[in-house]
Amino acid sequence: MFGLSPAQLIILLVVILLIFGTKKLRNAGSDLGAAVKGFKKAMKEDEKVKDAEFKSIDNETASAKKGKYKRERNRLNPCLILVFQNLFY
């Protein structure tokens, strides 16, 4: 691992413990854990917001399509509607 033997890793860990102390390392670990937890929570909330936006866009498009076709039918001559239906179906 990183070109270090197990003995060198143990010595490195002991030096780090002596420099920072166990209390600071514990605090750093808990701070890192809280940061990761907050990041995951923010990602889940962002996904919920995106899902809600997509659903609202889908609903808007569906209602716009329904309204558009109704308006088109009201504007066209009923005879033309029958002719077009026979041509395309």
Curated annotation (Swiss-Prot):
Q: Which coarse location class describes where this protein primarily resides?
A: membrane
Leader peptide range in chain numbering: none
**Record keywords: Magnesium included?**
no
What processes in GO biological process is this protein linked to? protein transport by the Tat complex
Subunit structure, briefly? The Tat system comprises two distinct complexes: a TatABC complex, containing multiple copies of TatA, TatB and TatC subunits, and a separate TatA complex, containing only TatA subunits. Substrates initially bind to the TatABC complex, which probably triggers association of the separate TatA complex to form the active translocon.
Q: What does this protein do?
A: Part of the twin-arginine translocation (Tat) system that transports large folded proteins containing a characteristic twin-arginine motif in their signal peptide across membranes. TatA could form the protein-conducting channel of the Tat system.
Q: Which family does it belong to?
A: Belongs to the TatA/E family.
Q: What is this protein called?
A: Sec-independent protein translocase protein TatA
Q: Which organism is it from?
A: Haemophilus influenzae (strain ATCC 51907 / DSM 11121 / KW20 / Rd)
